[in-house]
Amino acid sequence: MPLVYMNIIMAFAIALAGLLMYRSHLMSSLLCLEGMMLSLFIMSTLIILNTHFTLANMMPIILLVFAACEAALGLSLLVMVSNTYGTDYVQNLNLLQC
């Protein structure tokens, strides 16, 4: 396995570990999710370019669109929670408190 792939897999694993460790704040969770999506985007682009699989050329672009939608929804949720509660704790997102 080339060193580039190992570095991208390690970046994904570090972002996943950060998501699992720092899950109390919504902003840190969103940053870790963005790191995971970025590493998935780079990995899928490299795999498609190296295998010359032309039918899957749209897959990284679709992944990037989903990452942008996820970021927009996450930031709007962050603004809503911080305006309502004054903090960005994930525990404020409990649906049973409605």
Swiss-Prot record:
UniProt topology in membrane: Multi-pass membrane protein
GO biological process, one term: ATP synthesis coupled electron transport
Keywords in alphabetical order: Electron transport, Membrane, Mitochondrion, Mitochondrion inner membrane, NAD, Respiratory chain, Translocase, Transmembrane, Transmembrane helix, Transport, Ubiquinone
Cellular compartments per GO CC: mitochondrial inner membrane; respiratory chain complex I
Reaction equations catalysed: a ubiquinone + NADH + 5 H(+)(in) = a ubiquinol + NAD(+) + 4 H(+)(out)
Compartments where located: Mitochondrion inner membrane
A Pfam family: Oxidored_q2
Residue intervals passing through the bilayer: 1-21, 29-49, 61-81
Subunit structure: Core subunit of respiratory chain NADH dehydrogenase (Complex I) which is composed of 45 different subunits.
Biological role: Core subunit of the mitochondrial membrane respiratory chain NADH dehydrogenase (Complex I) which catalyzes electron transfer from NADH through the respiratory chain, using ubiquinone as an electron acceptor. Part of the enzyme membrane arm which is embedded in the lipid bilayer and involved in proton translocation.
Full protein name: NADH-ubiquinone oxidoreductase chain 4L
Name of the gene encoding the protein in the UniProt record: MT-ND4L
